Amino acid sequence: QQPVVFYIDTLIQDSWVKAIQKSADEWNIIFEDLGIGKPIIIKPYEKDSTFRANNPMINTIAFLNNNNSEVTAYNVTDLRTGEILSSKIGVPRDLAVSVRRNGVYQMAEIDPRFRTYYIADEVICENLTARMLKAFGLSLGLATNLAGSAAYSPEELRSPEFTQKYGITASVMDNVLYNYLAQPGDKEKGVVLIVDKPGVCDAFTLKYLYAATSENESDTLKKWAMEHDGDPRYFYGKRSPAYATDPRCQNYDLGNDPIASLDAQIAHVKYVVKNSPAWFHDDNIPNDYRELFPDFVIIELINKTLSPVSSYIGGIYINEANEKSNVPSYQPVSADMQKKVLQKIFSTFYDLSWLDSNKDFLRLGGVNPDMSTWIYNNGYPMMSLMFRLMRMGLSVEKSTRPYTQEAYLNDIEKQLFKETLNGKPLSAPMIAQLSVYISSLKGMCPTLKAIDKAVSTRVTSIALNEQTNHKLQSLGLLTTFASISATEKQSGMEPMTSVNFYSGTDIEAICYDKLKSTRRYLIQARSLASNDIERGKCDYLIAMIDRVI
């Protein structure tokens, strides 16, 4: 047994060195429990003239004096054996940029220390400790485990006793930092708000990798693994392929309840929209930060709230096959859960008026239009929903009571025309989403795509003139439609990097039927329009369909 010595750059300030040491100490606690002692040792760069930080045979923690704002880590390995020869970890000069960008949106409502541009060094050190936990884990041979953050319930993650004992994730090798399921007042109760220690899965992995075993090592390791069979805390989640998305293995997710997770994140962003202008009135704050701040809200909404929750639609839980395991290899997300998620996405993302409610917030970015309109006109959330439609095939195939593509589109259609069914004109958000919906349905039908292309090249149509058609622009319709399309087959040669053995389900007939039913609903919606502009919008959407059917 040899110690793992890391040489740390003397340019790193003392408070950060202590934060890094704290991270190493947390890993050493697990090693001590295994009877191995404290193998991770941190020393300053040696002053000896022969010392070289770029020596591939020594472990280093370097100060990165560049524009990067994330902790980086990679291993130098022996390609013949896979042995880790050394680890190279980088601590960025601009770590505060990353803390400020991600922490404010997720934690400002819970932790007042994030309600400012000037993030305190104490907060940065907490973040550095959290990030170094994963970096050290990588150096010890642990792989990214995207399922770690999905192991615990929202109730557990709001419990002071639970979070102080177990942390906020079963594995720090996941891509999660903050306990955004916490609510105002939880910090004062003692709820842990940031990753602060390795999880139970990490502890087990160290035992599996480093603990002494009997002579029959293989049987011992299998026995240890089977002791936790079916326990979500010990599930190792790889990045899943697009055609078989495991919703437990998503970036930025937290907790085992996607609805509660979405509600918590939306509440935090609402708080930021309402209160953030008061945090950034100092003239010394860089203008580029203020100007981009509202745009980060859109990124937060789409990448960190919409994407993880939408993965449950057509999602499938994938477990490693084992002859002794009672856990099925493939278990589709239940139809009820998929329907709940779809309904939640509509109820959440089709009322974004709160995004535009604070004009001071919008003015942070200069002369900003309504942000909700920008989101709708760029195809969200319909783009995400139609993307999931193309990934439902395997889930439907493996389920005994599937949520089929046809049922999914029926539910989307009911939501899109909810106003029409209640005798009301279509709202602007629904008009924008319908254009994406129609374009995506056409894009998933190779025959209709061919017809649409032929019509476009044969006649001077609306599509050819929409870039300069001021009448269309005055109607508030998209001039360049966002859509989801099936991949076109083209001739040619390119390097083959992977082989995909899965062939998607042919849903062309279903999409064609939905276009026809959408047309019928649009005719009904047109009759409910209160003015010529609304009727013009309906006419344009009907024309989109008539081009191909």
Functional labels for PLM-detected ranges:
Residues 149-549:
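Conserved catalytic/binding loops enriched for acidic/polar residues
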